[in-house]
């Protein structure tokens, strides 16, 4: 009972959505960290080719996000129908990857996955915002992200065991496709449309022009692309680095890699809600500064994991722990900031552009990381120092965002802090 009292009192539909996201993310966790290893070490493609193929999902994701951003603000489409279509497309992408044996098929599967994900994220984030009052919005996003992390963690653990025992990569991809179909059923049966029937609608490109003319939002977009490039390293570059370069080239086994990422997700689960509550007194910009600091420290420890003569596993554990804190600090803060900036009638457009940052970050991140992993150990190790070197850039942009939000707050009486979200 004490645990139940500790949980926020959210709309019932948010809990149902979180349950569906958890089940879907179990399927994603089956394959998320193993796709690069499978297609490089088992299928025989180069790390550069696989990185580019994984990044191709971002191209179709951009299309999906633009389509989804307009669709979810339209009463004719809305949040629910967009979510249902996204699940069907994502399941097709998983099944395509399950039977891929060459680069063309790998790219096709990733293009479908990217399109489905592009439609999914703006719609699901809009549903959470629609159903949560301002004072609960940060915790509502934390709960849905918590469900994502629990599902991913379970999927990673189960996936690593099955891969260690049977190398059943393709079976896990099929299971991922089935998880999307299960989520489709939950959405169809239990999630009603949340868009307001009388909501004002902006036709044509007007809504996009308003969003792209928002100076605060544009500054946020710049730093968000950088942070999502960091996020992309976790499931695209890090698994291959751990396998082929960690411990001065000795690497870790698939089971060890799976355990490391289960640890990472476990900490993200443990910290998600406490960190969301801890960040309430801080401005959104300060919350993102905290996140970016932990990203930089984590990347530095990954470099040590590769070059240290001993203790590589310990450094990997510490690095992924810090990255879990970075992720838990980032996700609810970023989503709540975007909703705070967006007019209600343009919530889908703003969330779509926010999601585009993920598409761009996941286009740049795997391509850069894959190219680095095709280089000699010195360059592969140095890649992490390059990421550390980008941290001051992110902090500088966030200081500019903080000043801009303070100016807007003084002129509009709006307060851009987590306790108003």
Task: Place the predicted regions along the sequence by residue.
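Conserved MFS/SLC helix-loop-helix module at the cytosolic interface between two early adjacent transmembrane helices
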Residues: 63-99
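C-terminal membrane-cytosol helix-exit motif in multi-pass small-molecule transporters
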Residues: 179-197, 397-402
């Amino acid at each position: 009972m004490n645990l139940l009292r500790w949980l926020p009192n959210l709309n019932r539909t948010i809990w149902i959505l979180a349950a569906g996201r958890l089940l879907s993310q179990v399927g994603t966790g089956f394959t998320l960290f193993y796709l690069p290893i499978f297609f490089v070490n088992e299928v025989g493609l180069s790390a550069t080719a696989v990185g580019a193929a994984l990044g191709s999902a971002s191209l179709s994701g951009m299309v999906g996000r633009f389509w989804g951003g307009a669709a979810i603000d339209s009463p004719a489409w809305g949040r629910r129908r967009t979510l249902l279509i996204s699940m069907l497309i994502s399941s097709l992408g998983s099944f395509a990857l399950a039977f891929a044996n060459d680069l063309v098929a790998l790219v096709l599967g990733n293009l479908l996955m990217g399109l489905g994900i592009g439609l999914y994220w703006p719609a699901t984030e809009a549903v959470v915002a629609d159903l949560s009052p301002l004072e609960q919005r940060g915790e509502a996003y934390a709960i849905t992200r918590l469900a994502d992390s629990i599902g991913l963690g379970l999927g990673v653990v189960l996936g690593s065991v099955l891969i260690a025992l049977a190398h059943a990569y393709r079976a896990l991809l099929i299971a991922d496709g089935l998880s999307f179909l299960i989520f489709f059923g939950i959405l169809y049966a239990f999630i009603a449309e949340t868009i307001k029937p009388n909501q004002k609608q902006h036709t044509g490109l007007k809504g996009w022009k308003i969003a792209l003319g928002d100076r605060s939002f544009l500054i946020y977009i710049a730093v968000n692309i950088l942070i999502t490039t960091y996020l992309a390293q976790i499931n695209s570059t890090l698994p291959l680095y751990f396998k082929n370069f960690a411990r001065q080239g000795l690497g870790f086994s698939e089971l060890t890699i799976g355990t490391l990422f289960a640890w990472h997700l476990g900490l993200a689960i443990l910290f998600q809600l406490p960190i969301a509550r801890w960040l309430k007194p801080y401005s959104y910009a300060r919350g993102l500064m905290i996140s970016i600091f932990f990203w930089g420290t984590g990347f530095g420890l990954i470099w040590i994991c590769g070059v240290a003569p001993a203790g590589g596993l310990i450094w990997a554990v510490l690095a992924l722990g810090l990255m879990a804190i970075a992720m838990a600090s980032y996700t609810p803060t970023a989503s709540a900031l975007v909703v705070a900036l967006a007019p209600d009638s343009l919530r889908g457009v703003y969330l779509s552009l926010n999601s585009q940052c993920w598409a761009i970050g996941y286009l740049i991140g795997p391509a850069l990381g894959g190219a680095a992993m095709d280089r000699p150990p010195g360059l592969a190790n140095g890649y992490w120092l390059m990421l550390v070197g980008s941290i001051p850039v992110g902090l500088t942009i966030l200081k500019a965002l903080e000043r801009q939000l303070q100016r807007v707050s003084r002129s509009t009486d709006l307060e851009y802090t987590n306790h108003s979200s």
